[in-house]
Design a protein with these regions (language model features):
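Active-site/acyl-donor-binding loops of N-acyltransferases
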Residues: 2-10, 33, 60, 119-144, ...
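Residues at the N-termini of beta-strands
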Residues: 69, 103-105, 238, 274
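Non-catalytic accessory segments adjacent to catalytic cores
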Residues: 86-130
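Short catalytic-loop micro-motif centered on adjacent basic/acidic residues
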Residues: 106-107, 168, 274-278
């Protein structure tokens, strides 16, 4: 089993990532964006007997002055069917051949559920339990999607559809969505939340030639005033919910229910097969968790982080 840390082709990586409906963190543009912000990114291709088995993208950070931690989040991308034992062999090979000075630590959080991962991977130790996320299958019909919604969520959607809200698309040029980033910053400061730097979103959107195909930003207006907005990042056949904001009026009118429903229609037209609403934290963000889980998507618990 050989690991190649250079000589990668961005187009071929993107094609594999799209075909496999890969997560945002394994997207080539994700790594390019992190490097633009001064964060180290490592990419690997694993082969056996000349046949490619996996692609893996790591984000590496120094921890104090002691060690470097490299995280392969929601990866690797498996290029062909492998058993749990074979996958473990790939992870061990990546860990052993990581091109960083010691002391170093390689972490993997595969984009797999506990049921599909096998959990017991020889040579790997789970150090963190898996997070849960909500996935909406956009290949389902409108009738199927609405039937899967929590009845209260669906009732709020129906109410929003009759509330006179005007939903429109926001352009992907920075000046067109700068106000949304300002609102997101206010939310983070008020609630004590952290996340990717807001500048990261701008860099990611513009890491590709066609910025309009990389992001979907929808805004709902009530009585001529901004009431709510949601921003989704598109990577291949998957979209990930990234930013959401609502005014008091927007919350009263259930604007986010309507925006999400219209985003589903728009993303489906763009060829997106799956919408990832992101992590569910019922303790710190109970309201947001209820919104995501009520949308009718499938709650998936990933297998965790391994070293």
């Amino acid at each position: 089993m050989k690991v190649f840390w250079d000589g990668h082709d961005a187009k071929a990586w993107d094609q594999a990532h799209c075909r496999l409906a890969g997560a945002l963190q394994q997207d080539w543009a994700y790594g390019e964006t992190m490097m633009a912000l001064g964060v180290a990114c490592l990419r690997a291709r694993v082969e056996r007997d000349g046949q490619p088995l996996a692609l893996a993208q790591f984000i590496a950070r120094r921890v104090g002055l002691i060690a470097t931690v490299a995280l392969c989040a929601h990866g690797p991308l498996w290029l062909q069917p492998l058993s749990a034992r074979e996958k473990a062999q790939v992870l061990v090979a990546l860990k052993r051949q990581l091109p960083l000075w010691r002391p170093r630590l390689a972490l993997f959080s595969p984009d797999e559920t506990e049921a599909t991962s096998g959990l017991r991977w020889p040579g790997m130790t789970r150090v963190v339990t898996g997070e849960s996320t909500v996935i909406i299958n956009l290949e389902h019909s409108d009738a199927q999607l609405r039937a899967a919604m929590d009845p209260r969520w669906r009732n709020r959607l129906v109410a929003a559809e009759g509330a006179g809200l005007q939903v429109q698309r926001v352009g992907a040029n920075p000046a067109q969505y700068a106000w949304l980033m300002e609102e997101e910053l206010k939310q983070r400061l008020a609630r004590g939340f952290s996340g990717l730097p807001l500048g990261w979103i701008h860099h990611y959107i513009h890491a590709r030639k066609h910025v309009s195909k990389t992001a979907l930003i929808l805004r709902a207006d009530a009585a001529g005033e901004r009431a709510a907005a949601m921003l989704f990042l598109i990577h291949g056949q998957v979209a990930t919910y990234q930013v959401g904001w609502s005014s008091e009026a927007g919350r009263d009118l259930n604007a986010h229910n309507l925006i999400l429903w219209q985003a589903i229609q728009e993303l489906r037209q763009r060829g997106v097969r799956r919408l990832d609403l992101g992590g569910v934290n019922t303790q710190r963000s109970a309201g947001l968790a209820r919104f995501k889980m009520g949308s009718g998507g499938e709650v998936i618990t990933l297998c965790g982080t391994y070293m």
